[in-house]
Amino acid sequence: MSSAVPTNSDAAAYQARNYQLEMLEASMKENIIVAMDTGSGKTHIAVLRIKAELDSCPPDKIIWFLAPTVALCTQQHKVIASNLPAVQTRTLTGLDKVELWTEQAIWDAILKDVRVVVSTYAVLADALSHGFMRMSRLALIIFDEAHHCMRKHAANKIMQDFYHPTVSKFGPSAVPRIMGLTASPVVRSNREELFTIETNLDAVCKTPRAHRQELLKFSHRPELKQLLYEPPDPMGLQVSSQTLRALIEAWETLDIEDDPYVKRLRKSSLDGGALEKALMTGKTFCREQLKRFVDRSRHIFEELGEWAADYYIYTSIQHLKTRVQTSYMTGDWDEAERAYLVSFLSKLPAADIQITLSDAACLRISPKLEALIGFLDAMDDPEFSGLIFVKQRATVSVMTDLLAVHPRTRERFRSAAYVGWSNSSGSKDFLGNLLSMHGQLSTLDDFRSGHKNLIIATDVLEEGIDISACSVVVCYDKPPNLKSFVQRRGRARQKQSTYAIMFPAEDSAFDLAKWQTLEQAMIEAYQDDERHLQSAIELERVNEEVVERFTVESTSAVLTADTAMAHLHHFCAVLPSQPYVDMRPVFSVETDIANLRRGIVILPNCVHPKVRRSEGQRWWRTERAAMKEAAFQAYKSLYEFGLVNDNLLPLTNKPELKVNKLGSIPSIMEASEQYDPWVDWAYSWSSPDIHQSRVVVRLNGAKDRELCMRLAGPTVLPPLAPMTLFWDSETTFTVAFEAPERVPHVPLSSVEDMRTSTVVYLQATSSRLLSTKQDFTALFGPDLPHTDLKAWLQMYEGNEPAVEVYSRRRDPMLMGVVRDCSRYNEPLLFRRWVESGDSPTTSVVEMECDPFPRRRNLLHRQTLATKKLENDKEDTPEPVNKMRTVAADQCTIDRLPFSNAILGLFISVVVQQLETELIATKLYETILRDVGFTSTQHIITAISAPSAQALTNYQRYEFLGDSILKFSVSCQLFFKHPNWHEGYLSEGRDEIVQNPRLTKAALDTGLDAFVITKMFTPRKWSAPLISERLERVAGKRQVSSKVLADVVEALIGAAYMDGGHAAAQACIRRFLPEINLHSLDTRTLSRSVAPEGARQTIHDRLKRHISYTFENESLLVEALTHPSCDYDASTQSYQRLEFLGDAVLDMIIVSAIFNHPVQMPQGHMTKIKHALVNANLLAFLCMEFAIPEERASVEQISTLQFEVISNEELVELWRFMRYRGLDLNNARDASLARHRALRDEILHSLQHDPHYPWQALSRLSADKFFSDIMESILGAIFVDSGGDLAPCEAFVERIGLMSYLRRILDENIEVTHPRNVAQQLAKSNIQFLAQRMPDEEGGASYQCAVRIEEVEAFVVRGCLTAEEAEVTAAIDAIDLLMERVNGSASVAS
């Protein structure tokens, strides 16, 4: 069966309360009166209308919301203020004593910067009457309960005396727009009355038509029920209630001459007329107070019974005495009058009031109340919520107290009184007025939350005030008119609810029939709605064919009207999900004068405004066909806009649709062998162009203690950076390289001499005999011209017996390395000669020698032997001396002095550095030639893997490059694809920056050959030979794919360090050609990505507080637009800007960390970055980022004098977010409540604690939108400034993030996550198992079990989020583990 409401098979659905948007659209076109049932959301339509008007009207205009009662004003203002937290709003009612504001200055001060005023009708009418307010100042007037705009009502006075005359004189542009709100049953009841209201308000009554079906889903009709009771005995007053009888008798016999007012007038000769009037009318203050008190007491007795009357009289007297004793009364009540009243009432007999009774019969209540209690007692509903309407305020208070003590009701019903606040400030009823405003402040909130389940109220709760839907509504007295009948009935909105009216059993059949007739009229009205719906359903059975068809030429993919609806829903389903947002498309239908329909579809606001709203191009008889065609046009538009691919599928990365072009890349893969520069040098020796560099070695940096040698090669030598070599803990050598120079005309013989000198140096410090091959690729020699090499070799090559050296008495300073022939030529360091024996012929020559240092890895300080510690005691013995004595006849001594021989130890290190430099130079000259590096210094760091254990590795640069790449790709996608929503942008970025993509880039460019992974091992090192390199064939090696990806990112970081962003972009472009920011004109694009036609106004103070002046303010509007903001079709949500701002923030934070003077390892930098961009920290800063704003209030300083008091309030950034939704409101308020509770703790931690506040921030658990708008504003600034990071950095500084970063860096604040700390303490033998725990009320909490060494140690329960549970558990685990460690240490000691 077809239906006007699409079924599941249609793959379409309406969003909840979609008719509210329909009414909003209608109100933007003309003045309207929104006529909808009670509880169907009229106030929310008004809020949407206010938001729309604020976005378009000048900032000096005011929106005025009118309501009939003070209570309703208070409620509506609360709703408006909650939904417009950044806008200055205020109420103006009798509570403010507005009627006494007689100066324009007071009104001007109160309304300064106020955009929305909520008041009673009379306040605006009087303000207009006295000229304190003008129609020209108003942008919009909203009339709540608009059916009051009739006859002499203040609402009608506003229109007749001011609106209509202004229209007649100046035209429609001179008056505000009008919106009325009323309950549709009231309007339907009288068409003539409706026409009058429309004329008075210059508006047209509108009821949702296109979504009538949905409206009916949210309105429930209660069952009408009559409660009969026996009327009271007319003679009952004479036989019961002794206290009431005494009060009446005392009142009737009261002598007016005893009245203090009359006595005062008789003593005065000034005003005889006043005395005569008082005696004639019998009206004085005291007599009027007593008269009303007697009347109320009698009414209480008749309505509620004897106990209630006695209770009322007794409580009122006690209340009066208390007020007199505490001087609570106002100064205009004469002391004598107080004493007179107290004296009069004290003479009454005391009533016997028993509060705690077990027998209901002892309460002596009226038959009417007995019937009510019987009705309530019969209610068998655990979810009961009820409302009882009574006539008088006194009845409200007494009935509430009586139900609280009655045995049949006190356990089941949690009663509360509500009478509103009208006239409460100016009331002269000092006697018998038991209800205070303060006592009912929380009544409605308690009722909504379920803390109270029964409210007794006057007719103040009939209309307007938003209370929860009730299951029972009781009229204790018959409704006075149809309006009251309808309004009260509208309060019973729960399913299967009851609407009860109490009747005396002897009431005439006419009255009973009257209400039955009214009920039948209401039933018929609703049946009329249902007939319209049934008619629509019958119409939908018409088979109306929609033949729309679209074909993609390249793939032959086809879109038809029958498939478009499903396609459109799938497109929305894969959009980035957001809390508090329904991502389904919104369908609506408009009707023309021929009753034909055209479909409209609106997509979520993360979709670009150009294709967010689509209309059908034809008019149809059925809604089904209209919506089908609208869906077709919408999806076709998505394809044409580039949001759907040629297969007519979303550009999504969902598994079922993804085609992974990269394939599967293993973690360990085959890559090119590390580039060997000595192969190129080996070939170069066939026709050498010899270059050399002077190598200068200084001991402990002293210039007067230096050694020199020369390094030569067959081609140009790259510049080499100085090195520091660590001999021992007290001795270092600095190796410096002078600028290389070409050496022309070097004969072959000299080259051979250099090879021989290289052997001399290498052999001098080696215990093993070198190979006979001497075709070294790199040559070393003394610091002499090549023509002097032969003489040098003749002098220093080889060795001689030690005995011969001894006989020549060589200077010990010129001694070479001693070699013990008996121990395989073990090298030793000569100390002194030792002779033993009695005569020269029998003496034995020996040498005292030190062992030759075994240490060869001179590059690393950490391999040094530990020397004597500074805190050692002076008598600590020195380590055993390893000096040896060897026989001279078993030793030889090298001719090369040890002072020169030591240079041989440095050759391996020099060659290793030269090799690294040659690899970097080759990379610089080939793959990176267009990047623009100025030197190879940063390249060496970027290509050195940690496994090589070199002095430097790529990890820090990879940390920097990762953020630069993310930033660059984010910018590229954002500016290149202004049509893409955040989901596409995120998936597109992930595809590019993922490790497999970077690994492939490294392989495609040949970068894999230049990644240095080989570890330098000096003990196994051998000088590279020409013969070996000429025979070498390049092979493969096993490399981690992540290492290749890391090196790409590290090179990007190196390029940034070398040449800033320009070099980094060139490097990115080399490996990822599709990323080319230089080809994008960001200044032009910053305007093109802005929403078109945005007219929203932004608070000037916000713009100043951000410290950035937007050229395109619509970007700031977009940055503040939450995905739930569905009422603005011209602005996209902030998600795109938040995507960009996230990358900008990363770039700023990472740059600051990286450029700090203290170099930190990558792991620590990563921890700091994660702590700084933590969503809860950003959310906290968002809540703290506030704008000072002036507010004015009026204080009464005397009877007729008022003073304007100015004060300053802080308006936080989050208040400016544009959104819609009660759930979001509630979540926001809950987050703010947690912020208030945790604020001092978090601020103290950020300013003083040595640890990052992980636990406090996890307990904050702020909703994501708080941090999102920080990042989206950052993105907006970046776009508007044309890609300039400087103003972005200024904003990050302004919110306080940079100052905390500096504190972390300067004071070494511990930022390690507690979970990681616990894992370190437990040596990773610990598990945290977080789990969601549903509760009986439908909510949930989180717990986290901690297992240490496979044993459950404890469980943390009752946390708001899994993160809070895990952080709390980790902190407790740290305490436990530290106790164990300390306990073990104590036992050990």
Curated annotation (Swiss-Prot):
Its EC number is 3.1.26.-, 3.6.4.-. Residues 368-537 form the Helicase C-terminal domain. The record marks K1264 as: Important for activity. Residues 23-203 form the Helicase ATP-binding domain. It comes from the Eukaryota. GO terms for cellular component: cytoplasm; nucleus. Its cofactor is Mg(2+); Mn(2+). Coiled coil: none annotated. This is Dicer-like protein 2.
